[in-house]
A protein has these predicted regions:
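Intrinsically disordered, low-complexity regulatory regions enriched in serine/threonine/proline
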Residues: 2-35, 61-246
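Amphipathic alpha-helical segments
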Residues: 31-55
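Beta-strand-connecting loop/turn residues
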Residues: 57-59
Length: 246
């Protein structure tokens, strides 16, 4: 537990991050300092709670287990503010930009499907679901920086319950498919994650569902080139034999 509220530790923390503060009046970190603070505050929390480790700026993951791994990362609202998102990366599902690419390494990791806190999606005013590089209401001094840090920690406390619920609800492939079905019916997620239908079909193929082919063919791709590229990867999936095991 970080004890930011002792005078000496507050002063030390402020002194550590002072070189990254570039506004004379208010707390405003540059990008390097902000990521440094985020990892200082959250690396241990995420490791202790979910056994995920930092793999790059603003991203934590575990190792592959049954073709997938958990990923918690920053969901950037803009260049200055973010919240957390949490989801899964799949070893056997590619990502398409201008061509099919695989996302199997820490460097290339991609969160295929994820969720955000309902408190963030439906937020009204400041409900501690977002943190940022700067806060104009706090002065650039030890006390102001303490409050800035405290706000970051409150965001984690606000989001924590939803993260736990999500990973419990997607702990098996069967549960994962059920969750994806729910999200495909949700207006918000169908808008920000239209690729959930692709993830759904790929998982069905991986667990050897006889419906996988039909599910894939129902997907509305932007063009045939994209569909063909995905289908090539889809056809090569080796099925998983432990679908019904917890």
């Amino acid at each position: 537990m970080f004890n930011f509220f002792k005078k000496d530790s507050n002063s030390l923390l402020y002194d550590t991050y002072k070189p990254f503060l570039f506004d004379e009046k208010h707390v405003w970190l540059n990008s390097e300092g902000w990521y440094k603070l985020i990892h200082y505050l959250f690396d241990d929390k995420i490791k202790d709670e979910f056994n995920l480790i930092p793999i790059k700026n603003g991203c934590w993951a575990d190792t592959y287990n049954d073709g997938r791994r958990r990923v918690i990362s920053l969901f950037h609202i803009n260049t200055s503010f973010a919240t957390f998102k949490w989801g899964w990366n799949f070893e056997y599902i590619p990502h398409y930009t201008s061509k099919i690419t695989w996302c199997r390494t820490d460097k290339s990791i991609y969160t295929h499907t994820f969720e955000l806190s309902p408190k963030f999606i439906n937020r009204k005013g400041d409900n501690y679901t977002v943190f940022g590089k700067f806060e104009s209401k706090y002065k650039n001094n030890s006390e102001g920086f303490q409050k800035f840090v405290s706000d970051h920690l409150k965001v984690w406390d606000t989001l924590h319950e939803a993260i736990v619920e999500y990973y419990n609800a997607t702990s098996t492939y069967e549960k994962m498919l059920n969750r994806l079905e729910e999200n495909q019916k949700d207006g918000y997620y169908s808008f920000i994650l239209p690729t959930n239908s692709i993830i759904y079909a790929f998982i069905k193929k991986y667990v050897h569902s006889i419906e996988a082919e039909d599910d894939f063919q129902k997907i509305l791709f932007v063009d045939e080139k994209v569909k063909d590229a995905y289908y090539k990867a889809f056809s090569k999936i080796k099925w998983y034999s432990n679908f019904n095991k917890s």
